[in-house]
């Protein structure tokens, strides 16, 4: 049985409920039944000794108004919790991962340590993955044990970077455990490809899988393969590249926030979600650029170039099926991605919205 997520986000609802749903008490149902979309086998054998990874330096992240100090001053609680100001002050594994990556590149060991300690004690599951959400208004605050694979990837990447930079073997060990857990619990083999699932539960059933192209954080995946070339990340990278070259739809050949893959290889925008190049998919060109894969960013770049040439604003989303666009402009975070990939000047002030600010700072990274 699959848990189907909502097609639209009601006003006031946490955006990540759109992709996760509350699965508490239903996990046994999710893993039951026969399906041709099967979870990938658990990795076995010893974990190779980590290879040296590049050591981040402060020069590899922005300074001034768009920087880690500015971001942490606005969104980091002293406890180490990154606060999503756009979603009722919740926290999630994604935000913890973004914050930890930023702090590592900025050389802020104290903040990194606080964020990891909060994440470890609050979200870490026994299997090495992270519960995806912390809601201070809920009882208990962590009430959905499902993970968010992009959050796991970001945290594992940050731990690997920081463990190397600050010579912390425990962080490297935890990074390795998270990588193995991702491969064993958050991937699916379908249509002859091994692909990242958005979460362990609720996204693969009956020979189909719902996937999120923006969960391919290329600098992180490359770092995983470099640290542990025997774990299988080369396959994830190769098959993820295939996915992103195929997940192009409509007049402008843009990726959508969510796609559905069938066992025969048919790929389409996820039918139970809006067919938008929007909130999630804007990270596809960002991660492609940061990961040295400009070809994967090209459709978005060409679309944005066309908008500029026509003297039009960059819309918050475009419907790839109808061509309709949002009647409001993209956020400062998207504008920062456009400046990174197309050229031009990015917004000079950090947004007061968590997600837009994340995108702004990420666009300054030079992994």
Where are these regions (language model features)?
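N-terminal carbohydrate-binding/catalytic regions of secreted carbohydrate-active enzymes
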Residues: 61-149
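Short glycine/serine- and small hydrophobic-enriched flexible loop segments
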Residues: 100-105, 154-164, 219-223, 286-290, ...
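Bacterial lipoprotein signal-peptidase II cleavage site
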Residues: 31-39
């Amino acid at each position: 049985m699959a848990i189907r997520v909502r097609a639209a986000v009601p006003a006031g609802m946490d955006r990540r409920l759109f992709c996760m749903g509350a699965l508490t008490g239903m996990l046994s149902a999710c893993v039951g039944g026969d399906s041709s979309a099967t979870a990938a086998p658990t990795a076995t054998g010893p974990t190779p000794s980590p290879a040296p990874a590049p050591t981040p330096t402060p020069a590899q992240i922005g300074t001034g108004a768009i920087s880690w100090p500015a971001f942490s001053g606005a969104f980091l609680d002293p406890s180490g919790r990154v606060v999503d100001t756009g979603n009722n002050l919740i926290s999630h594994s994604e935000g913890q991962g973004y914050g930890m990556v930023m702090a590592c590149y900025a050389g802020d060991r104290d903040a990194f340590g606080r964020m990891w300690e909060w994440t470890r004690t609050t979200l870490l599951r026994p299997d090495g993955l992270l519960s995806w959400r912390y809601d201070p208004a809920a009882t208990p605050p962590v009430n959905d044990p499902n993970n968010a694979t992009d959050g796991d990837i970001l945290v594992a990447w940050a731990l690997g970077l920081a463990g190397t930079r600050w010579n912390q073997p425990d962080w490297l060990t935890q990074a390795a455990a998270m990588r193995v857990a991702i491969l064993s619990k958050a991937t699916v083999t379908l249509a002859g490809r091994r692909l990242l699932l958005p979460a362990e539960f609720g996204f693969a059933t009956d020979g189909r899988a719902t996937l999120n192209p923006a969960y391919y954080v290329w600098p992180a995946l490359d770092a995983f393969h470099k640290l542990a070339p025997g774990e299988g990340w080369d396959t994830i990278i190769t098959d993820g590249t295939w996915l992103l070259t195929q997940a192009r739809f409509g007049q402008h050949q843009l990726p959508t926030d969510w796609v559905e893959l069938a066992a025969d290889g048919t790929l389409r925008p996820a039918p139970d979600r809006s067919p938008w190049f929007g909130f999630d998919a804007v990270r596809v060109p960002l991660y492609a650029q940061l990961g040295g894969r400009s070809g994967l960013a090209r459709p978005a770049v060409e679309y944005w170039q066309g908008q500029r040439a026509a003297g039009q604003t960059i819309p918050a989303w475009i419907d790839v099926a109808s061509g309709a666009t949002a009647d409001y402009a993209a956020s400062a975070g998207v504008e920062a991605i456009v400046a990174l990939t197309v050229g031009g000047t990015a917004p000079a002030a950090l947004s007061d919205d968590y997600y837009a600010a994340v995108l702004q700072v990420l666009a300054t990274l030079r992994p």
